[in-house]
Amino acid sequence: MSKTDNRLMTFLRPSDKNLDAAKFSENLSSQNVLDFGNVNAMVVRTSNDNKYWIIGLSNGTIVLLSTEDSEKQTNNFYTLNADGETLPCSDLQPVPELNGQIRDNCHLILAVYVSGHARLWHYTGAMNSSRLLATITEERISNPSDAPVRTNAENVMNQILSCSCSYDGKRFVTGGVDCHLRVYDMKSRRRLRMCSSSFTKEKMDGHVMRICAVKYHPRGAVYEDYVHIFITGGWDDTIQIWDDRYLHSLWIYYGPHICGSDALEIESESNHILSSSWRRDKSILQVWKFNEELMIEFYNSAEHQGDELSIPTGREIINKQTGALYYCKPVAEIPQDAYDGPSKGYVAKWLGPYYIAFGGSDANILKLISRFTLNFMSAIFKIPGIFIGS
C-alpha cells in the first residue's frame, strides 16, 4: 500500500484561522482537524481493529488514516480510488469478521457510491489491482409513481445512499433513490433478492421514497434470530423493520424524515432504535422500542421456500400491526434547544452505555448527550460547512 499525495488533505491546529468559527463547550477541546479543501467528507468509520479512520469523500475517494498518533504522522494515510469514479462515496462499512475474529487477511470494506456502484475493497492489498475485489452496478428500477421513462433513454443508474453488512459477514444490503433494497451474498457477490413495497393502496409494506439509512440489527452478532433483521429509514417519513429473506417490510414507525446514513441506529442491549429527523421538529432525537413481538408473530407465520420466507394467504397477521399503541410512538424524545437555535438532524449515534451523539445542519452542531438525564454534556457549535455524518 503506497502513500498518496499529501496535498489531498491538510492538518489544521485549533488555533488556525479556519477553525475560528467553531465554538467548543468548556469541557471539550480539539487536537487537530483534517481539511480536504473543496472536497467534503461524506462518511467516517473506524476499521474493525480500530487502526484506521476510513473516510468517504465527495469525489469518490476513500481515505484511510492511521489512528495511532495521527497528529504526529501527517503523511500516514492511504487512498482507495476506482478508475473513473468521481461521484460521492455516500456510505461505507468495514465488513464484520466471521465469529468476531479479526484476521490480517480479511480487511474488507463495503463502499457505495451515488454513481450506482457498490464496491468491495481489500484495503491491505499491495497494489491497486489487488485492493478492488468486486464492483456491482445497480440500474434504477421504475416505480408506479415515477414519471414515464423515454424508450430511447439510456439505462439510468440507481443512486446508492446507504449500505449495511450482516453481522455474520455473509450478506449485505444497499438502499438508494429507487426505493428498492438489494440483498447480496458477500462471498459470491450475487444478488439474492430485491425487497420493496407492494406499491398498493391497501397497505404500506416498504418505502415509497428514497432510502437514506440501512442498519443490520447488532444482536445478529450473537443471536441467530436477529442475523437476518435490519432497519431502514428514508424520505417517506418512516422507519421500517425487515427480514432479508422476505420481500416486504414487517413493521413501520411513522414520523422521522431520515436524510443521512448516520441518522438511524439500534442499540443491542436495550433493543432501542435511535433516529434523527431532518426537519425543524420539536425534538432532535427520537427513541423507539424495537418490536420483538412482531418477530415472534412473523417466525410463527412464515414458511421457508429455499432461502426465502413467505407468508401463506390468510395468515398475514404481521400486517395487522398488533400492539400499535405501544410501538407507534417514541418511548423518549430529546427536544430542540431554544438557545442553540433549531437544527435538522443528520446524525444519531449510541455511544456506549452512557452517551448519545447528535449532529445536525442549520445550527451546524455536534452534541454529546447523557442517556440517563437526556441533558447535553458537551457540544461543538457553528461547525464550518454542513454537518452530515460521523
Where in the sequence are the language-model features?
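WD40-repeat beta-propeller superdomains and closely related acidic/aromatic-rich repeat-like regions
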Residues: 1-390
